[in-house]
Amino acid sequence: MKLSRLIFILILLHSLSFGVAMAQHVPANNNHDEERACAHQWLLEHGLNTKSLSLSLTYEDIGFLVFEDSRNHCFCVVANKEMWPLLYGPVLAYSTEVALYMNSKPSQQYNGVMKPFRDQLAALKMSAAGPDTATAIYTPKNKEVLPMLGSTKWNQYRPYNMFAPTKNGNRVLIGCVPTAVAMTMRYHQWPERGEDCCYYMMDSKTMATMDFSKCTPLWKSYKDIYFPEDTLDEGAQNLSKLMVSIGLSVDASFSDTGTSASMKNVKPTLCNHFGYSGHIAFHDMRRHNLTEEQMEAILYKELDEGRPCIVSNAGHAFVCDGYSDGFLHYNFGWSGHYNGYYRLMTGRYNKLISGEPPILVKYFISGIEPQQPDGGVSREITLKKAGTLQDMLTDTEKETITKLTLKGPLNGSDIKLLRKMAGANDGFSLDGWRGGALTELNLREAKIKDDKTAYYSKPAKGVWTSYENNKPRKYDFSKSLTKSDWISFKNGPGSRMQGMQIVRTDDDKYFEHYFCQRDMIGKFMFANCSSLKNLVLPITTEKVDDHAFQDCTSLTSIVLPPSTESIGRDPFRGCFSLEEVLLPRNLNVKDGTICEGCSPILRSAKRY
């Protein structure tokens, strides 16, 4: 082994030993024979050699044990025996690709990956649910889908970051999001060349441009793994440039100690610059009100259809690229370290220990695949009656139309469908819908009508304050309101709302519903329409309300019609591709609030 390669391995293992211990290293005299036998048998059944396998109990965590054999590059995580009756199975995770190389202090990576197991086992102890008699949301089509990324073992360090910017005299880390995106693109071997350009800030004062037409990935030249001395390798150099361009496009915050980026920015990067399908969708478990079972169902369906998913636990982005008999396979982008199979859920519990679901995957991106050359579909439709758009389109058209011109009256059901076609991910569905591909929407000759059909709904959050006899009264929807508080809210501020309504369900949950108002682009009307690149508003538009286009991450330009009289708060927050906003000359608005969270080139809105 070359000295530099040995040093690379030692540095990697040292970096993985960072962190705060959450349990205790195993004393030599501990005895867990049944758990060890379980791990041994499990690994034998999954391909390890009978004669050479020799497992060591290297770590005793809270509720489970880590067994590994570094010579055979494997590990197996087994729950303590007393927990087995509460679990889907005693094995929580395993790998036949790599050992964990545990020492007396578990690493930050270890704690990030294993903490969900601690939390789930604690939840099961506190309140285990009975047997699951419900019909499965989705049944996987296969017993297994082999890891689609194969033996890819990339990371964020040298040589992957050799063309990255420098800070404090050091090359910044590539970041987990660009690494996960690059690994997924390698699987698809797409594109041959990038397209268009993006703007980014080199520092607080200097803006630069990235020309993606000069980005030509050498897919056939990329290796499964590179080492620090591979800086002269043509494939390594090309890959580093690709990863840097991805990082700049997703607006990564580069640092020499850790680089971060928003998962929401992945779709516009792939669609706008690398020729990927608009069917890509970002899922946020809490924001989209998804259950653990629903998250798992979508992941399995994507894998069955041959699409790896980029997933995240809120601290690290990685790739889910396969499954086997109840376990999901992850490639963590840590030079192969920790790659293996993990249960998303270990058993059924009735309530949570903390405020968030105790699973490893809390966010993920589905539908990642190249746009087909003939995938664009254009339609022009004139509606004679509001609410009939659904009947004017076939199911295939709803999913595949990329350019749409609409004329005539529109109501809430029409807007709701347009949102779905334009990439808004408003809820869980396994009905075959692949996600919206609509990139260009022309509503110039359309007219928005008053309506009581909600075009958008979301869980109610935050605190509402009303004043009674000059005294404030607060209603906190992050908590359960008392019956008297709810009646007071309904008869007070709730009765005075325009264009929205807050409702209470039988299981004591609260939701905000938003409705169409005549000639108004209402609150959140096109929010999260992540496929939209160009949008022409109705010429009769009189008002644009708060957050109307929030998180339209692919939107590049927009013109507010001359009839527009007012505009609400933060209409374009999170539209990070937005480069141009044209406003009527007499529209009264503070330009500073218009451009927050948009492309760096958009310093202020232009007047006409």
Label every PLM stretch briefly.
Residues G47-E82:
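Exposed beta-strand-loop-beta-strand "reactive/processing" segments of non-cytosolic proteins
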Residues L87-T259:
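Active-site-adjacent structural segments surrounding the nucleophilic cysteine of cysteine proteases
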